[in-house]
Amino acid sequence: MAAKIRQNDEVIVLAGKDKGKRGKVTQVLPNGKVIVEGVKIITKHEKPVPALGKEGGLVKKEAPIDASNVAIFNPKTNKADRVGFRFEDGKKVRFFKSNNEII
């Protein structure tokens, strides 16, 4: 099955503490989760690893959120949008459902 949300898509968060935030998808995980730039920042406690020269301490990083909690952002309408698929010239393409424009 083709993915409706892919890496480098601009998305908007629909639910959770970061609702309304926009960001670029940096990674799509196989378990149905996505990592979005600047969204769901968590603080991890890292142990020092002297062999690799890593210092320990608190590290801020993005945590994965469920793909159902994000929607692709349509720059023409400035709103969240749904994604559809269709064939054009023998190729499967994604399009915005609100204005039928190819992504």
Swiss-Prot record:
GO function terms (MF aspect): rRNA binding; structural constituent of ribosome
SS bond list: none
Listed Pfam families: KOW, ribosomal_L24
Keyword Ribosomal protein: yes
Gene Ontology CC annotation, any one: ribonucleoprotein complex
Keywords: Ribonucleoprotein, Ribosomal protein, RNA-binding, rRNA-binding
SMART domains: KOW
GO biological process terms, semicolon-separated: translation
Subunit-structure text: Part of the 50S ribosomal subunit.
Family: Belongs to the universal ribosomal protein uL24 family.
Protein name: Large ribosomal subunit protein uL24
Natural source organism: Actinobacillus succinogenes (strain ATCC 55618 / DSM 22257 / CCUG 43843 / 130Z)
Organism classification: Bacteria, Pseudomonadati, Pseudomonadota, Gammaproteobacteria, Pasteurellales
Name of the coding gene: rplX
